[in-house]
From Swiss-Prot:
Keyword Chaperone: yes
Protein name: Probable complex I intermediate-associated protein 30
Keyword entries, A-Z: Chaperone, Mitochondrion
Keyword Chaperone appears in the UniProt entry: yes
InterPro entries on file: Galactose-bd-like_sf, NADH-UbQ_OxRdtase-assoc_prot30, NDUFAF1
Pfam annotation, one family: CIA30
PANTHER family: COMPLEX I INTERMEDIATE-ASSOCIATED PROTEIN 30 (PTHR13194), COMPLEX I INTERMEDIATE-ASSOCIATED PROTEIN 30, MITOCHONDRIAL (PTHR13194:SF18)
Length: 227
């Protein structure tokens, strides 16, 4: 074989290899585990917050209960929502009755480029919870918050395991829990963290609302590519 034909064949082979590499490398798996809640080590990646930090009386916990029957362990986010305020509180908050769990800061980012939805496997109490995604700002500037927050409601059916699938397009930009009217696009390649929260005001029509106890079991959180 001449040197020219050898070079041509090598070029063709390299092109075929590059095309194969592109297909395999650029299309992400159908699903991607983000967080799981199967051990106490898994729960150490999260911290709790509530209105008690601002004079409220709500409380929350995140635990792995010992089932004792050999079944798989799952995290339980539970507590009590109160719309009352501590007597003599120095804080002037407009509303109380909320609790949440947020992933702790970590080095790097969660890359959700190529995915269409967030999925949570949960078993709840009939309340509506709030799923939040925190992303890095597209452009950071002085005086600007270090991240953007995007929120969507997720219903937790009572006493039944349910996989909630929330398209990323359904997450709306928010500021301090309120939807803001601004044209923004999520930066899915630079996710800084996530949270799950609940408030006494409820959410979806027909969902349980008001002050009182709440409880939701969480198995895992994944990113999905939808068909």
């Amino acid at each position: 074989m001449s040197r020219f034909r050898s070079l041509l064949q090598a070029s063709v082979n390299a092109t075929k290899k590059a095309l194969t590499w592109n297909v395999e490398e650029w299309v992400p798996p159908a699903e991607k585990h983000i967080f799981k809640f199967h051990s106490k080590e898994d729960l150490k990646k999260w911290h709790l917050y509530s209105d008690s930090e601002y004079g409220g009386l709500s409380s929350a916990s995140l635990e792995i209960p010992d089932k004792g029957d050999g079944s798989d362990c799952t995290g339980v986010f539970s507590g009590n929502l109160s719309v009352d305020l501590s007597e003599g509180s120095k804080w002037n908050i407009s509303r109380s009755g909320f609790c949440g769990m947020r992933s702790k800061k970590f080095d790097g980012f969660i890359d959700l480029d190529g995915y269409d939805a967030i999925a949570l496997r949960i078993r709840g109490d009939g309340r509506c919870y709030i799923s939040t995604i925190y992303t890095e700002n597209w452009v950071n500037s002085p005086g600007q918050s270090e991240d953007n927050s995007w929120q969507a409601f997720v219903f937790a059916p009572k006493d039944s395991w349910y996989t909630a699938k929330i398209p990323l397009a359904r997450y709306l930009p928010t500021w301090r829990g309120n939807v803001i009217d601004v044209e923004m696009e999520m930066n899915p390649g630079r996710v800084l963290g996530m949270s799950l929260s609940v408030n006494a005001e409820g959410g979806a029509v027909g969902a349980k609302s008001g002050a009182g106890d709440f409880r939701v079991e969480i198995d895992w959180i994944k990113a999905l590519r939808l068909p």
